[in-house]
Amino acid sequence: MSKENIVTRENTAVSENAVSEPTVNNDVGASATNSVTHPAFTLNVRPDNIGIITIDVVGDKVNTLKAEFADQIATILQQAHALPKLQGLVIVSGKPDSFIAGADITMIAACRTAHDARVLAQKGQSILAQIAAFPVPVVAAIHGACLGGGLELALACHSRICSLDDKTVLGLPEVQLGLLPGSGGTQRLPRLVGVSKALDMILTGKQIRPRQALKMGLVDDVVPRDILLDVAIQRAKAGWLNRRALPWQERLLSGPLGKALLFRIVRKKTLAKTRGHYPAAERIIDVVRKGLDQGGPSGYEAEARAFGELAMSPQSAALRSLFFATTSLKKETGSAATARAIHRVGVLGGGLMGGGIANVTATRAGLPVRIKDINPQGINQALKYTWDALGKRVRSKRMRPTEQQRQMMLISGSTDYRGFERVDIVVEAVFEDLSLKQQMVADIERFGAAHTIFASNTSSLPISQIAALAQRPEQVIGLHYFSPVDKMPLVEVIPHEKTSEETIATTVALARKQGKTAIVVADRAGFYVNRILAPYINEAARCLLDGEPIESVDNALVDFGFPVGPMMLLDEVGIDVATKIMPILVEQLGPRFAAPPSFDVILKDGRKGRKNGRGFYLYSNPTKNSSPTKNGNSPAKRNSFKWRKNKVKPVDASIYTLLGVTPKAHLGAGVITQRCTMLMLNEAVRCLDESIIRNPRDGDIGAVFGIGFPPFLGGPFRYLDSLGADKVVQALRLLVQQYGERFEPCQRLVTMAEQQQQFYPVDANIDEVTDVAS
């Protein structure tokens, strides 16, 4: 055993007051619904005097920590403490692929005040303090997800051993819900791995893989899964060992000067990223520093207080609403029918989108994929997409080369339709050309199986027109991905009037296997995401034509909470691609979607954005990849999270001369934001009224995951409820007077304002709202 892989007994400053003792039966399994007769925590003592505490919440696929489990843990520890010959404890999970996925955040629903939530955190701190102060070594044997409260429990143990397995990840993701770790995580983690690494983990919510966890000192050993328990038992038998020293860099940063510099830099970078919209990030910094500066008692007290206050914040409520919305959506099939089994998938087109779709199908769904492209180079490009993605995992030691080869063997390609007779669903990702897509439908009906579904990745063409000449129109559907496919979580599933229920259910099932969140939307121009994005983009362009500088427009919307400004978005998407959908929207939905004349002038000047190095901003190295149009891309599709990392680019000032505009900031950020976002909100309500989306929940998910609507606002409909329909109607009518009829509030919004209605039930907890009437 390496001297660096050690066990340490932690001194804790948290109160160790015992909690009440329930009657428990330690000889039976656990149950989330009946914790008295079926405890989630059981203790078995081996002949060698090592106690094994098993966590198994019966009835749940994964373990989550619930408030009622506190009494069970206290009882287990008291029973173990009473064993005079006990040499150590090992905590393991009874689930096959999960340690503890986190705390059950529905507990927050029972908290009506910040004080209630603070008490909840203090209870968690007290229980974990008992583990930390236990008189014999306690070792966590971790396999599978060890997140949130699960990692906080592991941190309270004296040693952590984890399995070398892709399913094993460790992290503190509470910040993603507008919270901070409330059971000691902000205090124990910095002392274990160093303040710099701890802040990075807690502020980002990132998940750490086993080898990385070992390197940073988060775990003491990484072993194959089949010997995990044996190694943990031996570690417990080894007794108390000295704690491994922190690396010199972390020791330097823990000193007065290093610490002051580190926190100053971290706070500056955090505010630059969050723009002040995510108070949890700032509270995390404060709480971690307080614990380091003033010691454990002050740190734990600050952690509990901050947890309580954040739990009651509107930002956390909005983020938790999104969490529960996506969780409920994942349980739905999108149809009353049963999905057909999917064994093989076909992809038409080997471009950016086709390659991405093949990638997630093979690597996430684990399904064989057959790619068809007219050019062998297209097939090679698609194969390279997945090879490169898997190669990154191999280089970071998150995957073995043999596994890379195995997953690559799931993807094959051809310039003809050989192999498509065995395919269950085909995803088409070719040019946005109606006649071409109709020909693809005919080809699949000829060369595919009788049951093969044809799913088009179109971003603008009506699915009914794509299916117009089909012999089996009930098996034609839209499946709209967003780029980059392996990063963007949303897909729109678009049935037309003849699409069968089985086709809908099967398509949703495929999307879910690919790791996607799927919303079912109606077959009308722009579907949902691009339809609400179009007026937002148009209005930003009008602000530019009014003389507002490009950077002022973009900064206003980024400050509001979007990941990237609308002008930068146009450059990233491709100005030609972004404007292509506008005529279709105007034709089907009316003149309010008419693009400002500036787009025609810009396109005639040869400006397409980043891809050809000419757009609203200057680019020294334009990207060499092909036009997004070729791959079925759309304005929302290029809304990659990587934009957050882009450095500020200089504006191409020549565009002002081209447009005949003299730039001068005069509107103000509030005016710009209101003009752009009010149109988006109004259009979202129209989509709900026209049944483009099934309910407000789907509309919120689509906007946040599809175009980056500020998550801390919860989505357009949560945001509308927070503003009040009457205030929104009032604002829109004022904008009508100032800028024209395009701001006319839709009738549903007017009616809701008159009747003082909301989109979500007023008295319902966000945890309880899984669906709402449209």
Swiss-Prot record:
As recorded in Swiss-Prot or TrEMBL, the protein's gene is named fadJ
The record's InterPro entries line, in alphabetical order, gives: 3-OHacyl-CoA_DH_CS (IPR006180), 3-OHacyl-CoA_DH_NAD-bd (IPR006176), 3HC_DH_C (IPR006108), 6-PGluconate_DH-like_C_sf (IPR008927), ClpP/crotonase-like_dom_sf (IPR029045), Enoyl-CoA_hydra/iso (IPR001753), FA_oxidation_alpha_subunit (IPR050136), FadJ (IPR012802)
Q: Which HAMAP family has this protein been placed in?
A: FadJ
Give the similarity note.
In the N-terminal section; belongs to the enoyl-CoA hydratase/isomerase family. In the central section; belongs to the 3-hydroxyacyl-CoA dehydrogenase family.
Recorded hits in NCBIfam families, A to Z, give: FadJ (TIGR02440), PRK11154.1 (NF008363)
This protein's name? Fatty acid oxidation complex subunit alpha
Q: Which reaction does it catalyse?
A: a (3S)-3-hydroxyacyl-CoA = a (2E)-enoyl-CoA + H2O; a 4-saturated-(3S)-3-hydroxyacyl-CoA = a (3E)-enoyl-CoA + H2O; a (3S)-3-hydroxyacyl-CoA + NAD(+) = a 3-oxoacyl-CoA + NADH + H(+); (3S)-3-hydroxybutanoyl-CoA = (3R)-3-hydroxybutanoyl-CoA
UniProt entry tagged with the keyword Lipid metabolism = yes
Where is the stretch described as 3-hydroxyacyl-CoA dehydrogenase?
Answer: 340-774
Name its species: Yersinia pestis (strain Pestoides F)
